[in-house]
Amino acid sequence: MTAWTLHTCDRLEERYWETHHPCGLRILVSPKKFSACYAVLGVEYGSRDRFAGGAVPMGCAHFLEHKMFERADGSGWEDVFAALGAEVNAYTSDDSTAYMFSATEGISDALEALLTMVSELSVTSASVSRERQIIAEEIRMNADDPWEVVYANMLRGLYAPTGNRQQDQGHPLRLAF
């Protein structure tokens, strides 16, 4: 790794350290006096990202976010983190996907688990089929949430037909990628 650089914001009384791993991963560390430790691993790939020709279906980033939680043996990473006394979660936005955990002990083991989780992808036909159903249910739940409906309508009104106005999860009729 390269040297660490200290960044400060006097106005907010915040500081964080930054370095870059040889693989290109940008690492930020912000020491806090909390009883719990929080770690976030984010990638710059979100719901609006496309490749030439639109070859990536809408909702692909969200689908991959979900799939990262499944282990090769079919079990879930949630169980691994729970056994370590940690909580794990993730989210997909229009421009990024982030995986995170919080823990009060066993931080090194939880960090190792997070790095392993995002490094190993297990996809089978059966797991894709199961995940489609889970994401379809998420989409239905959001369609029944007034706040989500207002937000989606606002995006459609503000943006031209681009990824910014689309649902992060994809469209229920297009879940058959």
Q: PLM features: what roles do these ranges have?
A:
Residues 72, 77-177:
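Acidic/histidine-enriched segments that form metal/cofactor-coordinating
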Residues 1-76:
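His/Glu-rich zincin catalytic helix
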